[in-house]
Amino acid sequence: VVLVAPTSLDFDRARFAANCFRDGAAVILNCESLKPEETNRLKDFFTGCVYSLDGTMRRAAKDVFIMVPKGVGLDEDSQDESEDEA
């Protein structure tokens, strides 16, 4: 599992986490320290990564997202009801 908790918009670190995801690691993206527009940019970046690799992305909290690669399940009970906003 790779934890990404940026304090500013950092695509080098995001690229590292995306490469880990591509290689089969789950990624937790904690954007609580970012501005809303920065959160949206990172969320969009990772949404594209997850989609292109047939993974799954779920909202765990307001600005926290969990991404798992294809073939790895998520406990449905842990999903936030607002997942559609992710």
Predicted regions located by residue number:
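Short, solvent-exposed loop/turn segments at secondary-structure junctions
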Residues: 36-38
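Positively charged, small/polar-rich N-terminal and surface patches that mediate targeting and assembly
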Residues: 1-27, 32, 47, 51-86
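DNA-recognition element of transcription regulators
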Residues: 44
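Generic recognition of short, well-ordered alpha-helical segments
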Residues: 16, 40-41
